[in-house]
């Protein structure tokens, strides 16, 4: 750049003690703006940024900008129309400073040291909250340009620097909300400003998410609903699905990963569809960040706003489900996460939302809307009476059928936990066999998803355990007899689940194929060292000994002719010995868990002695087991 020429052109502004003393008629103003445009363009070159920082020009620009904005905001001696010149000067100076600090920490420090804190925290925040400059709205384009450049300045100052962002966040978060609120119904007329503003708010909220007003949360949900209706179907490249899936399985991104390229001015036409998609992604991320991270949100006495928020989110999901657009999977997951986190807040009873959710379940085919509704309903059940009340609004059969529509792993969370809460001994008895088959099909499909989303495993196992516990043994036997693959599904869920299933099958008094029994015993005895707590806890050991005791007491379930030929003696005698050795070591323990396990072990030992007492020829392993059993007495 021709640095001397630029300095010469800016001399009247730079040398004046106050910018108010500088001539601002059209000729002079046009000259200043032209020189600053030249400077802003030249600052796209990194070497030129170094020059303005080291020569003091940047320092002077900060001073001029603060003076100009102070006149705009506080000087009542000049008319609003006369202030337009100062707003135009401010706009160009903001542009120059924004470009000067791109990827330049030295210049960022110059900005701070020269009074930049007040400039950024107060004056730029004020620019973001401008609604108009002139009463006739004739300068709306100037306001738009001022605000867009201010957002760029803030973004270029913060990007890649956590400390700067944390310091700026408390002062800028509110003005950014105001900026977005004023554009809610006209965002397509200033798309670049809105997208950049929402992106900056996204970064700000990552470090400053507490104490956001409930009304602002409602505003975000309202804005999301509006954008959702404007999103249009879009042809995506074949590779995008894979890219989206990979991104969506990543938890909240680290600050350092939030882009490494500062915004450098460009003159391009904004694609309306891209604006909707980008804004939808940014705002859904903003809302999710707040409701997921801020545990102090208090929804007390805000029931109507909460209901409206959840309605907005569910309607957005319904609207978006049938559309194809960029980052769809990420957005849909974030929206159900928003609904789930709002409903999980301890100050939210979710009772008002029950009608909305049951209506959604009965009328909608949108899997993501259904998932959100199931999450909300799940969080509305906190007691047995809550469960009874909810089942008057919707039946277990209806809920089970809804589960067939779920596909995305994240959609299953509310379904699994809600069913677990609602199932009990009484209503399980009346479940139709078709519903039970459907339920197990859903659980198996969900089980396949746990390979990719491990967080589902505990929810699935808990529901499976509850289902096996409350179902009559005859129904479990009929299920397994009709579909042998159910046994392998149960067995894959480990010791406790297999013990519950085995107990029920033993109680049914009906014979099962030996393969089914073997599969369960293999799962029950899938341990290496009982002494390692992480391998098997007291609770699991209690259930194993309980199941072994029941089995040995009534070994007729194996259809063996000779008691000594039962499957535990034939195939699992080493495991049985290891269990008894471990339990025997609990003999002197006084905790209830150890005492219960020891009592079960003593019961098993008595049965073993009864089995072998009339047997003339024992193998060495059986002799060792007999001696071990005697040690319990």
Give residue spans per PLM region.
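Eukaryotic intrinsically disordered, low-complexity regulatory segments enriched in serine/threonine
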Residues: 260-269, 582-585, 617, 631
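Eukaryotic acidic, Ser/Thr-rich intrinsically disordered low-complexity regions
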Residues: 605-633
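Eukaryotic tandem repeat interaction scaffolds
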Residues: 340, 358-366, 375-392, 397-408, ...
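C-terminal structured domain segments
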Residues: 572, 576, 580-603, 607-609
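Fungal intrinsically disordered, low-complexity polar regions
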Residues: 242-266
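HEAT-repeat alpha-solenoid elements in large eukaryotic scaffold proteins
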Residues: 29-43, 87-100, 147-157, 197-205, ...
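Elongated alpha-helical scaffolds that mediate protein-protein interactions in large eukaryotic proteins
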Residues: 2-93, 99-149, 156-177, 186-196, ...
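Alpha-solenoid HEAT/Armadillo-like helical repeat scaffolds in large eukaryotic proteins
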Residues: 12-16, 63-71, 122-127, 182-186, ...
């Amino acid at each position: 750049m021709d640095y001397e020429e630029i300095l010469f052109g800016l001399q009247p502004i730079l040398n004046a003690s106050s910018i108010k003393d500088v001539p601002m008629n059209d000729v002079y103003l046009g000259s200043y703006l032209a020189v600053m445009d030249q400077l802003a363009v030249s600052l796209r070159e990194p070497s030129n940024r170094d020059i303005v920082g080291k020569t003091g020009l940047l320092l002077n620009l900060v001073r001029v900008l603060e003076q100009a904005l102070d006149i705009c905001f506080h000087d009542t001696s000049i008319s609003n129309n006369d202030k337009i010149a100062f707003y135009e000067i401010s706009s160009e100076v903001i542009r120059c400073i924004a470009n000067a600090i791109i990827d330049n920490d030295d210049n960022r420090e110059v900005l701070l040291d020269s009074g930049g804190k007040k400039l950024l925290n107060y004056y730029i925040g004020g620019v973001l909250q401008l609604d108009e400059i002139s009463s006739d709205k004739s300068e709306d384009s100037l306001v738009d340009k001022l605000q867009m450049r201010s957002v760029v300045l803030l973004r270029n100052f913060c990007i890649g620097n956590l400390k700067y962002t944390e310091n700026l966040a408390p002062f800028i978060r509110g003005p950014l909300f105001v900026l977005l609120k004023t554009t809610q119904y006209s965002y397509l007329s200033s798309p670049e400003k809105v997208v950049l503003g929402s992106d900056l708010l996204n970064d700000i909220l990552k470090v400053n998410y507490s104490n956001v007003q409930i009304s602002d949360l409602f505003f975000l949900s309202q804005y999301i609903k509006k954008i959702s209706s404007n999103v249009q179907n879009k042809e995506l490249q074949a590779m995008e699905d894979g890219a989206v899936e990979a991104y969506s399985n990543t938890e909240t991104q680290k600050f350092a990963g939030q882009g490494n390229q500062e915004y450098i001015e460009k003159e391009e036409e904004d694609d309306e569809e891209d604006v909707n998609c980008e804004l939808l992604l940014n705002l859904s991320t903003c809302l999710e960040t707040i409701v997921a991270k801020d545990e102090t949100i208090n929804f007390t006495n805000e029931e109507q706003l909460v209901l409206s928020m959840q309605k907005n989110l569910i309607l957005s999901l319904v609207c978006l489900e049938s559309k194809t657009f960029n980052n769809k999977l990420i957005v849909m997951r974030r929206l159900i996460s928003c609904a789930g986190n709002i409903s999980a807040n301890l100050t939210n009873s979710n009772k008002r939302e029950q009608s909305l959710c049951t209506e959604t379940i009965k009328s909608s085919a949108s899997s993501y809307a259904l998932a959100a509704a199931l999450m909300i309903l799940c969080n509305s059940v906190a007691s047995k009476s809550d469960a009874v009340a909810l089942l008057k609004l919707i039946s277990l059969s209806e809920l089970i059928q809804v589960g067939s529509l779920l596909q995305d792993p994240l959609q299953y969370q509310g379904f699994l936990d809600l069913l677990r809460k609602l199932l009990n001994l009484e209503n399980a008895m009346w479940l139709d066999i078709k519903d039970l088959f459907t339920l197990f099909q859903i659980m198996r499909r969900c089980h396949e998803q746990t390979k990719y989303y491990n967080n589902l495993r505990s929810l699935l196992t808990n529901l499976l355990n509850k289902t096996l516990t409350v179902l009559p043994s005859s129904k479990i036997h009929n299920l397994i007899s009709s579909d042998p693959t159910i046994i392998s599904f149960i067995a894959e869920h480990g010791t406790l689940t297999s013990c519950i299933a085995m107990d029920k099958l033993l109680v049914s008094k009906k014979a099962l194929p030996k393969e089914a029994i073997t599969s369960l015993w293999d799962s029950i005895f899938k341990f290496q060292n009982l002494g390692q707590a992480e391998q098997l806890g007291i609770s699991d050991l209690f259930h194993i000994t309980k199941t072994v005791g029941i089995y040995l007491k009534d070994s007729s379930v194996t259809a063996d002719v000779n008691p000594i030929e039962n499957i535990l003696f034939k195939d699992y005698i080493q495991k049985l010995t290891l269990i008894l050795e471990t339990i025997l070591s609990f003999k002197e323990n006084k905790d209830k868990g150890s005492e219960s396990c020891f009592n079960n072990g003593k019961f098993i030992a008595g049965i073993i002695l009864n089995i072998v007492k009339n047997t003339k020829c024992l193998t060495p392993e059986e002799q060792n087991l007999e001696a071990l059993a005697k040690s319990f007495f």
